[in-house]
């Protein structure tokens, strides 16, 4: 229902307009206060890059963060990552992730990023505290990438990158809750790069698509072509589950059942195992896999995806960030 409201297919969005006007007024006032320096943002001693979005829901932001961290690491840059840690609840903050940190403590995306990149990752509702925790333990870190937080103006930033779903884009264009917007589309004029996941990019936007890899068995780590798996049940607890189901079909998989779950939904063995019958194979997102690995069964697999950015702009962006991190 919420997708229909935000896309404009349902007329119910009009009933929510008063709340949207209030949301827009408050969010605009907050940004203006920082712009006029009525409120002071904390500036880290190293450059900060924000990877965020203008809309609620999944846009492919986490794969972009992973891509960015890995690309900078390949260039010899030591990167740290901070996040709010949505979906997690730590005993205390800031929380610096380790191999023993669970998604219940830190949230799905931070654990996934930590496992994929081996970069220092810290979470805190106050992102400046997370930055301080990383720099205290890893003083050699040269640049911080913040996963989400475009609207978290308490943390000063040097570069802003926005990720857009190229198919859904901005829906009906209204602020939450009548529409998907956290900020209006005009905010794009002030950011450093706009990355468009799928769809048809517009002038000045960097095209991106998600490239699926081989399916990975949660229990054994065995890899295979996902099309070789039979009697597949697809499960996705991400911001926009239909994108994952479409990816499977693009890979030649016709799921016998598709199970969309809420983003950041907690998972347990009983609930997940009940999704498949004898002889069926469960295929999930990598984000779900970080929550299920501890209790996975032999017929559970996940399909990792990597961000693939096209054109000349990604190289220019990476050069800019490398020079920034190097102090040039």
From Swiss-Prot:
It holds the Pfam family LpxK. GO terms for molecular function: ATP binding; kinase activity; tetraacyldisaccharide 4'-kinase activity. PANTHER family: TETRAACYLDISACCHARIDE 4'-KINASE (PTHR42724), TETRAACYLDISACCHARIDE 4'-KINASE, MITOCHONDRIAL-RELATED (PTHR42724:SF1). It comes from Escherichia coli (strain K12). InterPro entries: LpxK, P-loop_NTPase. ATP binds at residues 55-62. Transfers the gamma-phosphate of ATP to the 4'-position of a tetraacyldisaccharide 1-phosphate intermediate (termed DS-1-P) to form tetraacyldisaccharide 1,4'-bis-phosphate (lipid IVA). Belongs to the LpxK family. One of its GO terms (biological process) is lipid A biosynthetic process. Pathway: Glycolipid biosynthesis; lipid IV(A) biosynthesis; lipid IV(A) from (3R)-3-hydroxytetradecanoyl-[acyl-carrier-protein] and UDP-N-acetyl-alpha-D-glucosamine: step 6/6. The keyword Plastid does not apply. GO terms for cellular component: membrane; plasma membrane. Keywords: ATP-binding, Kinase, Lipid A biosynthesis, Lipid biosynthesis, Lipid metabolism, Nucleotide-binding, Transferase. Its EC number is 2.7.1.130. This is Tetraacyldisaccharide 4'-kinase.
